Amino acid sequence: MSKLDEDVQKIGDKLVFNPYNTNNKEITTQEIKNILKQYGVPCNIYNDKLYKRAFVHKSYVKKPLLENESENILVVEKPHNCLPLSTKSNERLEFLGDGVLECITKYYLYRTYPKENEGFMTEKKIAIVKNEHIGRIAYEMGLH
């Protein structure tokens, strides 16, 4: 068995898509509220689906049937103890969030360093918003 990419494996002469993971669980609305409260974010949740989607990795999303058939990929049936695959991942929300985070960071740096030039602020912004830094913060917050 050889790994072709994150979610498709070659088993013998067949390609098999098996994204299921018994450790995956859907975040509850109460867990979302607890996280927001813990970090002092005043928020009424009107659409918990957006918050829940923020926790869906692209590897846990349904592959279109035609894509699987055209590539001759066998899709494993969902085990009884696993969440069903999602129709959407967090990718688009991540794109939007990255833009918001960058905007807030730029504003903060602009106000904090009024005498510095844009090159200085750009270097600081890059250091603050890089994935490793944000990943570490998310891990420390328990968002892993």
Describe each PLM feature range.
Residues 2-144:
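RNase III-family endoribonuclease catalytic core
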